[in-house]
Amino acid sequence: MLSRGWFHRDLSGPDAETLLKGRGVPGSFLARPSRKNQGDFSLSVRVDDQVTHIRIQNSGDFYDLYGGEKFATSTELVEYYTQQQGILQDRDGTIIHLKYPLNCSDPTSERWYHGHMSGGQAESLLQAKGEPWTFLVRESLSQPGDFVLSVLNDQPKAAPGSPLRVTHIKVMCEGGRYTVGGSETFDSLTDLVEHFKKTGIEEASGAFVYLRQPYYATRVNAADIENRVLELNKKQESEDTAKAGFWEEFESLQKQEAKNLHQRLEGQRPENKSKNRYKNILPFDHSRVILQGRDSNIPGSDYINANYVKNQLLGPDENSKTYIASQGCLDATVNDFWQMAWQENTRVIVMTTREVEKGRNKCVPYWPEVGTQRVYGLYSVTNCKEHDTAEYKLRTLQISPLDNGDLVREIWHYQYLSWPDHGVPSEPGGVLSFLDQINQRQESLPHAGPIIVHCSAGIGRTGTIIVIDMLMESVSTKGLDCDIDIQKTIQMVRAQRSGMVQTEAQYKFIYVAIAQFIETTKKKLEIIQSQRGQESEYGNITYPPALRSAHAKASRTSSKHKEEVYENVHSKNKKEEKVKKQRSADKEKNKGSLKRNISLTPCRGLRWADRDL
């Protein structure tokens, strides 16, 4: 479900264009109040390098695009058109994609703010917590720009023994001030919550609702992550447990690890025990890499301690990158490692450990000395050259099967050497630059297979590197103002390989790395936007090739002066005469505005309504 962060309360048409061109990618969109028709809204969408504006009608009974399907809430309308790609299109057939919400900044950096959430979802979270007077704040689904304070009471919902009742209190934003009704208004959501934490809120019945224990969110608008890092660094109010928010989030993550009950039977086989560096760090069966071409009559012959890992939080059309998370090689597994690299067509290997650290063997060298060649099982590997940088060593290797020496593949081996023996790097710049080089290499090889990432156990540093790269890719794909959830991303990765991201320090390092990545990206954007005529494509943030080239022939002009800039939205069964009249009227009224006729492909819409209690 999309976050409602795409609704921008105080944004004009020209400002929306500037924002979408400067911070969005093709397919980015946002919604804003109509400055022309009170109660209506405007949907602004980036199409190629221009911006299209579509009016959303609020009839009082339903929302629609002046034609097409009708919906109970604006959220349902937007979700429908994001899920049903191809519904919105110009008369010339150009598709208008709603793909990536360009979210506004959260109204507060407080962690009790959860953004988009239905009443039912809030109830489930609070009732599962089970502590009376736990509260959270979320977006209003029925009234864009307003909010809801959801609080778990100390009385059951119905009969004794039933779940505790949840009270939902509407928080209205009027004239830039916040109120729950009555004469009291506040400058910010934070001020409102802090006030009622002290006084409680009196219901119409005379009973009081108290705000005692916040239910913290882990979701955050990517552009606001620096503020979230500051919040997580704060100590708890209780002096006897002076733990920062990072500790809280990581402990919560650890408690959820028990939910990953996937089997690991192959790694437990007696014949495979010698292939595991650590006897209890084993691959899940459902996602393990299976060595091909092995004798099925030999138990365990297809086993290697490695798992496929994919970013399942991105859609199939948004992400093509797959990783293999593997343990560091043992003497007994080097041949299997090269078998895996060959069968998966891997061209990039990422090693995040030294061979020996603090006198302990972390990974046996599975490559030959520079300028030499060596046979590993069924494959010959040559170390063609090595290049040293301040942070890492790059080896250029060649691999070929012994039975076909003419078939040669080049593999780039990146070994990160600046990770300390204990803890994490003191700053993330080196890791970000390292990943930038890796991604440039992988992207230059269009048919390359998964990137193999390993450390020693294949879960701590390996998980940290993979999660950072996934989050960078999410921001690169969806734009700087997308929602990210680091805890949820780690949960998703842990469901594919157990124990990924091992320590609180690694957890915090991910936050700090993504914060620096986003800050650097913002600065690059500012520089590029100041250079007239250049496309908004910067650093690691690149547009998906399919989106870059889509509808390249569409000719569009943008409004620079008009407050309201709209597409004319018509259903396909509308008469052309009406369209021509609208075109003529717009031509006189909004010179310089974007004037394209949008047709709605007839399709039945969703008819459910999300609760906003």
From Swiss-Prot:
User: Which of the residues bear the PTM Phosphothreonine?
Assistant: 396
> Would the keyword Ion transport be found if you checked this record's keyword annotation?
no
- Which GO molecular function entries does the Swiss-Prot or TrEMBL record give? cell adhesion molecule binding; cytokine receptor binding; natural killer cell lectin-like receptor binding; non-membrane spanning protein tyrosine phosphatase activity; phosphorylation-dependent protein binding; phosphotyrosine residue binding; protein kinase binding; protein tyrosine phosphatase activity
The record's region (Disordered) falls at 549-598
PTM: Phosphorylated on tyrosine residues. Binding of KITLG/SCF to KIT increases tyrosine phosphorylation. Phosphorylation at Tyr-566 by LYN enhances phosphatase activity. Phosphorylation at Thr-396 by TAOK3 leads to polyubiquitination and subsequent proteasomal degradation.
Q: Which GO terms describe its cellular component?
A: alpha-beta T cell receptor complex; apical dendrite; cell-cell junction; cytoplasm; nucleus; plasma membrane; protein-containing complex
GO BP terms: B cell receptor signaling pathway; CD27 signaling pathway; cell differentiation; cellular response to macrophage colony-stimulating factor stimulus; epididymis development; hematopoietic progenitor cell differentiation; intracellular signal transduction; MAPK cascade
Stretches assigned to the SH2 domain:
6-102, 112-215
Report where the covalent cross-link Glycyl lysine isopeptide (Lys-Gly) (interchain with G-Cter in ubiquitin) sits: 310
**Tyrosine-protein phosphatase domain segment(s):** 246-517
Q: Which reaction is recorded as catalysed by this protein? A: O-phospho-L-tyrosyl-[protein] + H2O = L-tyrosyl-[protein] + phosphate
Residue spans with biased composition (Basic and acidic residues)?
560-591
Identification of the protein by name: Tyrosine-protein phosphatase non-receptor type 6
Lineage, top ranks: Eukaryota, Metazoa, Chordata, Craniata, Vertebrata
